[in-house]
Every structure is written in C-alpha cells, then in structure tokens.
Amino acid sequence: MKVMETDAARRSVIIRGPADAVNKAFNVQLNDYEYERGTYRSHDGPVQLPSNLADYVEAVVGLTNRQVHAQHFSTARRHGGRALGKESNAKGRGAAKDPANTRPLTPVQVAALYNFPAGDGAGQTIGLYEMETNEGPAGYDPADIAATMRALGNLPMPQIVDVPVDGVENSGQSDGETGLDITVAGAVAPKAKIALYFAGGETQNIIHCLQKMIHPSGNDPVPSIISISYGWGPDDTGTPSFSDAEFAQITGLFEDTATNKITVLVSSGDSGAQIASRTQAQTSYPASDVWVTACGGTTIGNVNGSSFDEYVWNDIGGAGPGATGGGVSARFQVPDYQESVTIPPRVHTGQHGRGVPDISGNASENSGYLQVIGGRPPEPVGGTSAVAPLYAGLMARINANLGRPAGFLNSTLYGLPAATFRDILGAPGPANNSFGRVQGYNAGTGWDACTGLGSVHGQALQAALGSAGPAVVAAAPAPKASAAAD
C-alpha cells in the first residue's frame, strides 16, 4: 500500500495498492458483482480498521465503484419539439393549469421580475458541479453555448474554466444540463468566472469533487458560490446510494462551506415528492442537507411589465411533465433555522425532519429558457436545474456589490420579513407536488414543501445581507445516522 496524497483541510488520505493488500489492510474480500447496468467492484464483510486508527477515520471510500444512481434535474432530456411561445394549460393530478400567457422567458427577464440588484458578478467565481450519470457523461459544446447566449438576447459568452476531477473532463457533447447551468448563471452574472467541475459517477468521485470545490489547492479556482443541479438519490436511511459513513463525509464537507463562506444552492428535483419510490414521498439528496439552500420550482406567466403571476410548478399531463421537488427529510432533523416555520409530518410515515425546499424560482419548461443542444434550433428547457444557477447568479451579484461573500444563507433567509419573498400559495394553479401515484405536500401561506419560502426579492436579500455584517455560521443538527467506516 502506498500513500499517494494527504490533505489536512480535506481531511483525506489517498492510498493505492493491489487487491490482496487492500483485502488485508481492511479485512475484506474484494469481488466483482453484476447488476442491471453491468459489473462493479465491492467487498464482502464490513471494513475493519486497526484500533489505533478506528477513532480517527470517518469513512473508507473507493472499495466500491458502483455508480451512484444520480439524476440531473433538467427537462432537456424530455424535449418533445413543442412549438415555441405556445400557451400552456397542462393538466393532471395536482396540476390545474399554468398562468395565462405562459411563454418562454430569459434569465435576464426573470432576474428583473425578481428584483435582482444591478450588477454583473465581477470578481466572483461560481462553481458548477457536473457529473456522469446513467444517461452519459457531462459536457458542453462551446458553439452551443454561444448560440444559446445569442438566443437569450445576444448576451456575451460566459467566462468558462473547466476543472477535471479524477481524470474526468468535458465530453465536448452538449448534455442539456451543463449548458443550462452555464447559460443561466452566465446570463445573470456575465462577469463572474464560471468554473465547471466534471466528476465521475462513483461515490469517491463525488467526494473528491466536493473537496476540490470547497478546499481548493494550487491552481484550483476558488468559488464563493456552488450550484448543484443533480440529485444523488433519496436521503432515506438504508437507500443504496451512500453508506452512513459516506453520508457523514459528504455532509461534513457541506458544513465546511459555512466555515469557508461559500453559498451552496441545490436543485430540489423535478418529479414532485417522488424520487425513487413509486408509492412513498421522499426528498432528494443533497437538496435535503441542512448546510445547503434547496431550490424548488415555480411557473411564471401573464407577464406585464413588472407584474406577473407565479404558480407552483406541477405540469403533470403537459408536454414537459414535471413538478417541484420537496418534502420532509428522513435523515436530517429539523435544523435550528427552520424552527420558525411549520413543517408538516412526512407523508406516509408521520416522521418529522428538515423541510425541503428553502426557496423557489422559475422552473417550468413552459416558462423556461431557450437552449441550443447539438446545433438544433433553440427549444425551451426548464427544471429546478434552472433555479440553482439563477440564484447562483444573484449571489454573485450580491457578493460583488457587498465586497464580501455571503456564505451560508439559510440562517438569514428564515429570519427575514415575509416581504422578502413572493409567497406561492397554490391557488389558483397547482396546489401540491403530488406526482404519479405518490401523494405529495400542499402549498399554502408561508413556508411549504412545494416552494419553500417562495421566490426571492433580490434587492431585499442584498439589503438584509448588507445590514447583517459578515456571515455568521449557524448551528444545525447532524444527520440522524451515525458515522461508521464502510
């Protein structure tokens, strides 16, 4: 066994060795296994460490290379060639209709409707997390990005920096998700640097990517904002994406972002309360992590100057079916910052936990953003994937305007006056995020598990962050699952 790298800030030691040495070091037996997508390596028996090390090791990752069942939350994967500008009246369970005159918008238009402060994000770096999924590798074609920026109003090309992780690079082919992240964030904050981190689909790749984003070293970019438009599976204890020890490692990294004054925005999902189960409501991870700001979805329509209607996003039965993700975490307790709001018990179990999302924004494909994918004509794309980078652009403006990073947002968000948000009541329009056969949660006054606190009044948020002084790290409960080596 050979030590390849040690990093105190990342709390990691990377070692390499032949299978026999690994088996002996951790008292396991490495084997190859078959599953529906091929073969993977894993081990028989629990990982065991010498007694003099066990108390100091939080997790052992990399013994298993099965790909995490990740999803990107963009409607790009379900394009149907729908005519542009067509009014939408999608109907289905929980989806009464869209607002009148719902049409594709641009990120700049939505930023104006949400009263974002003036600014361009100069001097800020937005880190965009991109990863390989079972749909293929992540990537973008610069020609598609340039064409999309023209379609969105002849906007300048974003300042893009590619950051490979574990040897994974831009595939060079537009996957829809990566381009949406780039163009939405780049439209709102045109002078911010857009750092694209490309990760593989294994647990160790996810951890290595987060370490690189949160604890940069050498020539790594230094992001003040991180946007994640992916889900790594439901956060239920016992689900296969991560072991308890891996969960502890990942949420520990997110906790580090608060100390490092990095704002983390995560999409809440595009299938309502349904994540993996076809019958029970779940929340998506990492949106449910207590150290991130989870972003749900709305539909905007009937725009007339600064006036507009905004509904819960639930387009079941429409050309681009989808609904805002949200619910109650099965893994994380109610954090201190959410004690001021009423979080319903988890559907089906009655369990109490962290509520998702925290805020929301324009997500419906029907009011979405034009995207050029593979050189084809522009088509509107939506999803909560469009919300996280939108608010990443807002935070780049705010950080640049205030001259300092805002850092962890949630402690501030839940202490702000109601006027800081546009409350999405659920009537008229969809009143819940039920999806398929899964019963979801109802929208209503104040925080709800469809749209959180609502869409954000950007100028009001900047004023609140400006008067609050430097960001303060607020306490939040650790996950319920205890950490143990895997």
Indicate where each model-derived feature is located.
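Substrate-binding/charge-relay-adjacent region of secreted/lumenal peptidase catalytic domains
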Residues: 1-9, 14, 19-297, 324-325, ...
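Short clusters of hydrophobic/aromatic residues that line enzyme substrate/ligand-binding pockets
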Residues: 286, 313, 337, 371, ...
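An often Trp-containing, charged/polar helix-loop segment at the C-terminal end
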Residues: 299, 343-348, 395-449, 457, ...
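Short acidic, Gly/Pro-enriched loop/turn segments at secondary-structure junctions
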Residues: 301-308
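Phosphate/diphosphate-binding glycine-rich loops and adjacent basic-rich segments that engage nucleotide
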Residues: 309-319
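Exposed, interaction-prone regions of secreted/extracellular proteins
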Residues: 318, 334, 472-475
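Long, low-complexity intrinsically disordered segments that are proline/alanine-rich
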Residues: 470-486
